[in-house]
Amino acid sequence: MAKKEVAKIKLQIPAGAANPSPPVGPALGQHGLNIMEFCKTFNAKTMEQKGMITPVVITVYSDRSFTFITKTPPASVLLLKAAKLEKGSGEPNRNKVGSVSMAQVEEIAKLKLPDLTAKDLDAATRSVLGTARSMGIEIK
């Protein structure tokens, strides 16, 4: 008999740095999952991306087992890394905090394409451009 799906948990965790403290511990603990087992498997799977914020969708089953899917880092995190910034502008319409090239934007769009609802690379690029604009990052 197939396992019954009980819940889906969505978290954003630094790759290779999951630990039982919040937000991971409480989110998994309330569903009765083995927190250390998740942390070990997540850290092993994301070791090569160490430090990047990684969205993860954890599927919890009725027998307290779980599976998880890692996604690509958010476009905002990738844009900040490309522009070598700590954070975006508080007033993106007035203050521009950095800039990225169109080639960098297209590279981010290629990376994000599997996780976006965009049908093609052009639509994904426009989505990343909108994210950059909302963060106060100029496009060269």
UniProtKB/Swiss-Prot annotation:
Q: What Gene Ontology terms describe what this protein does at the molecular function level?
A: large ribosomal subunit rRNA binding; structural constituent of ribosome
rRNA-binding as a keyword of this entry, yes or no, is: yes
Q: Which Gene3D superfamilies match?
A: Ribosomal protein L11, C-terminal domain (1.10.10.250), Ribosomal protein L11/L12, N-terminal domain (3.30.1550.10)
What does UniProt give as the signal peptide span?
A: none
List the Pfam families hit by this protein, alphabetically: Ribosomal_L11 (PF00298), Ribosomal_L11_N (PF03946)
Q: How is it modified after translation?
A: One or more lysine residues are methylated.
InterPro entries, per database record: Ribosomal_uL11, Ribosomal_uL11_bac-typ, Ribosomal_uL11_C, Ribosomal_uL11_C_sf, Ribosomal_uL11_N, Ribosomal_uL11_N_sf
- What are the cysteine partners in each disulfide bond? none
| GO CC list | cytosolic large ribosomal subunit
Q: Which GO terms describe its biological process?
A: translation
Give the record's keywords alphabetically: Methylation, Ribonucleoprotein, Ribosomal protein, RNA-binding, rRNA-binding
Q: What does this protein do?
A: Forms part of the ribosomal stalk which helps the ribosome interact with GTP-bound translation factors.
Query: How is the subunit organization of this protein annotated in UniProt?
Result: Part of the ribosomal stalk of the 50S ribosomal subunit. Interacts with L10 and the large rRNA to form the base of the stalk. L10 forms an elongated spine to which L12 dimers bind in a sequential fashion forming a multimeric L10(L12)X complex.
The record's listing under NCBIfam families reads:
L11_bact
As for family, the record states: Belongs to the universal ribosomal protein uL11 family.
Protein's UniProt name: Large ribosomal subunit protein uL11
- Name of the encoding gene: rplK
